[in-house]
């Protein structure tokens, strides 16, 4: 094992990376409220794991979506638990994100030189809400259907570009299979990818600049 470690150490400098991670200075004013961002990340990882598990059984079609969700809840071993954890973690992620934003704002964590960290955080907040909007529709029950119809109909009030924007969101003039497919793609591929990218940027900037000082 020693030779294997030495081989990787020579090429990757693992010890230097470990020393950097474990030797970061933590200001004395830091308290439990500074953990809200980390809790949000943990919730996101839980979402990825449970969501990935459900993709093995979920069918993104208007005729089979609801039945596949019922199958997960009733027939799949611990399917009810996986979906319940996914829902609970989603609510927790939104709550922790909101509290994290308030903490950063109230402690002045958005000020120079951390403006870009704040910008990436705001983008992550928008992505988090987008997860909720797209995920809510996937069971394709009455609540999900009408929620999608209302949400996608909101941009219609925008002059000139309103109607084309609605058609872009729905995939057609009315809510249907194209809408569900788009929301499923957003929820399971595009939004997780964007969230991972901006989270990486967010944490790298925090590592570089450190935690903001007290007011």
Curated annotation (Swiss-Prot):
| Gene3D superfamilies in the cross-refs | Cytochrome Bc1 Complex, Chain C (1.20.810.10)
Positions contributing to heme c binding: 35
Q: Which InterPro entries match?
A: Cyt_b/b6_N, Cyt_B6_PetB, Cytb/b6-like_sf, Cytochrome_b_N_euk/bac, Di-haem_cyt_TM
A GO molecular-function annotation: metal ion binding
User: What is the membrane topology noted in the UniProt record heading this document?
Assistant: Multi-pass membrane protein
Superkingdom per UniProt: Eukaryota
Membrane-spanning segments: 32-52, 90-110, 116-136, 186-206
> What cofactor is needed?
heme b; heme c
Q: Name one GO biological process term.
A: respiratory electron transport chain
Report keywords, A-Z.
Answer: Chloroplast, Electron transport, Heme, Iron, Membrane, Metal-binding, Photosynthesis, Plastid, Thylakoid, Transmembrane, Transmembrane helix, Transport
Co-factor remark: Binds 2 heme b groups non-covalently with two histidine residues as axial ligands. Binds one heme group covalently by a single cysteine link with no axial amino acid ligand. This heme was named heme ci.
Report the PROSITE patterns cross-referenced here.
CYTB_NTER (PS51002)
- Where, by residue number, does heme b 2 bind? 86, 187
The reply to whether DNA-binding figures as a keyword in the UniProt entry is no
Which cell locations does it reside in? Plastid, Chloroplast thylakoid membrane
Residues involved in heme b 1 binding: 100, 202
Q: Which Pfam families match?
A: Cytochrome_B
Is Transmembrane set as a keyword in this record?
yes
* One GO location term (cellular component): chloroplast thylakoid membrane
Function of the molecule: Component of the cytochrome b6-f complex, which mediates electron transfer between photosystem II (PSII) and photosystem I (PSI), cyclic electron flow around PSI, and state transitions.
Assembly with partners or alone? The 4 large subunits of the cytochrome b6-f complex are cytochrome b6, subunit IV (17 kDa polypeptide, PetD), cytochrome f and the Rieske protein, while the 4 small subunits are PetG, PetL, PetM and PetN. The complex functions as a dimer.
Q: What else is known?
A: Heme 1 (or BH or b566) is high-potential and absorbs at about 566 nm, and heme 2 (or BL or b562) is low-potential and absorbs at about 562 nm.
Q: Which NCBIfam families match?
A: PRK03735.1 (NF002990)
Protein family according to the UniProt entry: Belongs to the cytochrome b family. PetB subfamily.
Q: What is this protein called?
A: Cytochrome b6
């Amino acid at each position: 094992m020693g030779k294997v470690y030495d081989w990787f150490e020579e090429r990757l400098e693992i010890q230097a990376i470990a020393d950097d991670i474990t030797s970061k200075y933590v200001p004395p004013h830091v308290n439990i409220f500074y953990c809200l961002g980390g809790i949000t990340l943990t919730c996101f990882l839980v979402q990825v794991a449970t969501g990935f598990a459900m993709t093995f059984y979920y069918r993104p079609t208007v005729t089979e979506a609801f039945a596949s969700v019922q199958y997960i809840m009733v027939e799949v071993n611990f399917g009810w638990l996986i979906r319940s954890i996914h829902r609970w973690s989603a609510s927790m992620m939104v709550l922790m994100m909101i509290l994290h934003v308030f903490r950063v704002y109230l402690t002045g964590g958005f000020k120079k030189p951390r403006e870009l960290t704040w910008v990436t955080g705001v983008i992550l907040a928008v992505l988090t809400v987008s997860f909720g909007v797209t995920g809510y529709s996937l069971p394709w029950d009455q609540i999900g259907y009408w929620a999608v119809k209302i949400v996608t109909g909101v941009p219609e009030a925008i002059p000139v570009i309103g109607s084309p924007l609605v058609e872009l969101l729905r995939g057609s003039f009315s809510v249907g299979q194209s809408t569900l497919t788009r929301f499923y793609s957003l929820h399971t591929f595009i939004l997780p990818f964007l969230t991972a990218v901006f989270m990486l940027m967010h944490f790298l900037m925090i590592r570089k600049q450190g935690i903001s000082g007290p007011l």
